[in-house]
């Protein structure tokens, strides 16, 4: 028997407890600007820490290979119903353990090794699971990539021409570092014209899409994959949305195709997050995410930094650092010393190596969760620029860190 009072983390494992406490303090003290990170609600975390972690549930609601699944069936069906409502989807699978596995599930459902796929080039903003040479998607399939035009928007004309020439079996839209709106309808028409499947990976934009502040790909795509964290503000995991005609193939692809027992405690967290995302408060939050990102970009531009594509129409932006004579790797480290957390990121046609880069990726979801609005976004933009203007001045870094501390104390993550 486990007596709850005797089995607390601090008693059983002081080392892990200490690390958790330090990470909690870091999240409170630092302004999180990594576009793919966010803060989940205590309700989501409570679901993930529940007894559902004990339950094996291979299969799907009503069709399990284990007994005792009547209550986890309720949880999974709630998650399915809510995510379908959230995005207007015909069918959904909430079992993928990650966005990458959601993508893999689609590939296994409709492709064979050697088939041709077409996705956005990783070097110009795509994702490694869309055909990068070192990723399984690049090893198992013949990959052709589309990219950006001179205005650093997706080159839709070139995309269409390439699709007509190469006749891929699957066209993929979606990105990990692209700030503008993606014309899912146009790409969907290209796919239809050549008889290709169309998959959208909306992992970065899902929260914005749920709130109606970014185009919804669901009406135009055969499959839509997403993570459930990032802008959606749920637990770490994945989801596949699909047309009803593909539901059986996708379900078989996930189980028994690439996964065994689903993580029911995480699916519970997904269900809670989807319920939160259906509220008016979540819509208002996403509207503020977009406003904050726009102000952040405008501030950085005013301070002499170049934003790839010249602006953002979403939650994310790429900042070209070459004018400041600093690499993304160095900027990430120095901004971190000032308690501003960003990630190094390649810019289009980046001359630097992938682990060095000429840019950083900056996003607004996490700081907006804290309660930041336009005024704070402007302050953050100026603080970033202050660091980059004098990156090797210890006094400057200390001054910025003090200003960050004043902000984070006013806006705690978990009050």
UniProtKB/Swiss-Prot annotation:
Belongs to the SHMT family. Keywords: Amino-acid biosynthesis, Cytoplasm, One-carbon metabolism, Pyridoxal phosphate, Transferase. InterPro entries: PyrdxlP-dep_Trfase, PyrdxlP-dep_Trfase_major, PyrdxlP-dep_Trfase_small, Ser_HO-MeTrfase, Ser_HO-MeTrfase-like, Ser_HO-MeTrfase_PLP_BS, SHMT-like_dom. Pfam families: SHMT. One of its GO terms (biological process) is glycine biosynthetic process from serine. Pathway: One-carbon metabolism; tetrahydrofolate interconversion; Amino-acid biosynthesis; glycine biosynthesis; glycine from L-serine: step 1/1. This is Serine hydroxymethyltransferase 1. SUPFAM superfamilies: PLP-dependent transferases. One of its GO terms (molecular function) is pyridoxal phosphate binding. It comes from Cupriavidus pinatubonensis (strain JMP 134 / LMG 1197) (Cupriavidus necator (strain JMP 134)). Its EC number is 2.1.2.1. Homodimer. Its cofactor is pyridoxal 5'-phosphate. HAMAP family: SHMT. NCBIfam families: PRK00011.1. The gene is glyA1. The record marks 229 as: Plays an important role in substrate specificity. The modification N6-(pyridoxal phosphate)lysine is found at residue 230. It comes from the Bacteria. Catalyzes the reversible interconversion of serine and glycine with tetrahydrofolate (THF) serving as the one-carbon carrier. This reaction serves as the major source of one-carbon groups required for the biosynthesis of purines, thymidylate, methionine, and other important biomolecules. Also exhibits THF-independent aldolase activity toward beta-hydroxyamino acids, producing glycine and aldehydes, via a retro-aldol mechanism. It catalyses: (6R)-5,10-methylene-5,6,7,8-tetrahydrofolate + glycine + H2O = (6S)-5,6,7,8-tetrahydrofolate + L-serine.
